[in-house]
A protein has these predicted regions:
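Short amphipathic alpha-helix that is part of the acyltransferase structural core
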Residues: 1-23
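Generic recognition of cysteine residues
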Residues: 8, 46, 53, 88-89
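Active-site rim helix/loop that mediates acceptor-substrate recognition in acyltransferases
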Residues: 16-37
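Conserved donor-binding loop and adjoining core beta-sheet/short helix segment
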Residues: 33-70
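Short glycine/proline-enriched coil/turn segments at helix->beta-strand junctions
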Residues: 41-45, 85-88, 109
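Acyl-donor binding region in acyl/amide transferases
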Residues: 57-106
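Conserved catalytic-core motifs of GNAT/GCN5-like acyltransferases
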Residues: 94, 109-120
């Protein structure tokens, strides 16, 4: 996994620029090594996912995505199959507005909009 992770590092770091400063690359490495996060590499992109257990649902959250959109979207069915095998009933994702159209084409619905107010 470390070779793939290093190869995917530029895409992960680029995606982290939009994460609001919640994580850095070393946090992703730690999460992957602990098994809390999952890496989905493609030749020209990757996803990082996490399973979130809510009181009523278990979902697979697409935490980070970067690289060529087509290759990322090509993994869609494989990610769903894996999520189902883990007992998840949905995929979730927060992202930039540019994700709206390609996700809609794959059956995703926009559920809400996130807002942030940072303070000291």
């Amino acid at each position: 996994m470390d070779n793939e992770l290093e190869r995917c590092k530029p895409w992960i770091e680029a995606a982290l620029e939009y994460s609001g400063g919640t994580h850095d690359f070393s946090d992703i490495v730690e999460g992957l090594h602990k098994g809390v996060l999952q890496l989905w590499p493609t030749p020209k992109g990757c996803l990082v996912t996490e399973i979130i257990c809510f009181p009523k649902k278990r979902v697979l959250n697409v935490f980070l995505g970067g690289g060529e959109l087509e290759q990322i979207l090509d993994m869609h069915e494989s990610v769903i199959d894996w999520a189902k095998a883990q007992g998840c009933c949905a995929l979730t994702m927060s992202g930039r507005a540019g994700w709206v159209k390609p996700l809609k084409e794959h059956g995703w619905d926009r559920q809400h909009v996130s807002y942030v107010k940072e303070f000291d």
